[in-house]
Design a protein with these regions (language model features):
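Short secondary-structure junctions
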Residues: 83-88, 270-276
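Short beta-strand
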Residues: 279-282
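ATP-binding N-lobe of GHMP and related small-molecule kinases
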Residues: 1-102, 116-126, 138, 158
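ATP-dependent small-molecule kinase catalytic core of the GHMP/sugar-kinase superfamily
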Residues: 130-258, 262-272
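Active-site nucleophile and cofactor-binding loops and adjacent substrate-binding regions
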Residues: 105-106
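Conserved small/polar residues in nucleotide/adenosyl-binding loops
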Residues: 286-292
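Short amphipathic alpha-helical face segments that pack within enzyme cores
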Residues: 109-117
Length: 296
């Protein structure tokens, strides 16, 4: 019997970062994180399970993916099959509505959409918490893309306890806008996965990061609760810069920031001096971008 399902999920930007995994296999982070989900950038996915299929196929933006991506999706679908208790292979058709030049990682929305589509196709009846766990197995940040608005990813200590949940802001996110500034389109010399591991294992600054990130998280959540934009902005700026500082303490040291990154940060500071309420947070995707959050 052919089974199919469709879903849409939106990408998110971490305001309080996670940097480093405690468990690489189950994607368990070293610390909790806080994100905001974006309304303009999303992934739409259709998944079809068919007894006649002999392998999993992923069609991304109209093109079949390469062998490396195919292996990754097959591994993920094995997790889905184990959960569902069947061995059907699937055809996955996915469209990313994320501008390539913006440098936004689409894995968050991609795996959140895939998890939700599989849930529908296989009638798994998963709760949002269960969906968050399942999405996390594909991409850690995907755990947060199950939810709109603000979401916190609880690090937990195993597969069962590591999941995201929504943070109630009484709709405050609708009063906020995020601007993405593309710094450059050069590929990273150090991947995020490699950078996380190197920093976790060798940086003398890493423990300092862990010591302060919970404090940052609590302050950010309190700011969201009180709709205190200035406090939220101050916390997320400091948190992002501390994350990048840990990389400079790694052996060997590395950084994702370039001169243009600092130039863009300076522009944000100049805007604040001109009474335009805005703050920056930095990301480290394939194309370095500088998201700027503004109160409107």
């Amino acid at each position: 019997m052919v089974k199919s399902g469709k879903a849409r999920a939106h990408t998110n930007i971490a305001l309080i970062k996670y940097w480093g995994k405690a468990d690489e296999t189950y994607i368990i982070p070293m610390n909790n994180s806080l994100s905001i989900t974006l309304d303009r950038f999303y992934t739409e996915t259709k998944v079809t399970f068919d007894p006649d299929f002999t392998e999993d196929r992923l069609i991304l933006n109209g093109n079949e993916v390469n062998a490396k991506e195919k292996e990754k999706i097959q591994n993920y679908m094995n997790i889905v099959r184990d959960l569902a208790g069947n061995r059907l292979h699937a055809r996955i058709e996915s469209e990313n509505h994320v501008p390539t030049a913006a440098g936004l990682a689409s894995s968050a929305s991609a795996y959140a959409a895939l998890a939700a589509a599989c849930n529908e196709a296989l009638s798994l009846n998963l709760s949002d918490t269960d969906l968050s766990r399942l999405a996390r197995r594909g991409s850690g940040s995907a755990s947060r893309s199950i939810f709109g608005g603000f979401a916190e990813w609880e690090k937990g200590h195993d597969d069962l306890t590591s999941y995201a949940h929504e943070i109630n802001s009484n709709g405050w996110e609708k009063d906020l806008s995020m601007i993405f500034v593309v710094i450059n389109n050069q590929s990273k010399k150090v991947s995020s996965r490699s950078g996380m591991s190197l920093t976790r294992d060798t940086s003398r600054f890493y423990q300092y990061w862990l010591d302060y990130v919970d404090e940052d998280l609590n302050e950010a959540k309190e700011a969201v609760k009180n709709q205190d934009f200035q406090r939220l902005g101050e916390v997320i700026e400091a948190n992002g810069l501390r994350m990048h500082a840990t990389n400079l303490g790694a052996q060997p040291p590395f950084t994702y920031l370039v001169q243009e990154s600092y130039d863009a940060m300076a522009i944000v500071e100049q805007c604040r001096k001109a009474n335009l309420p805005c703050y920056f947070t930095t990301v480290s995707y394939t194309h370095l971008t500088l998201p700027t959050i503004c109160s409107v």
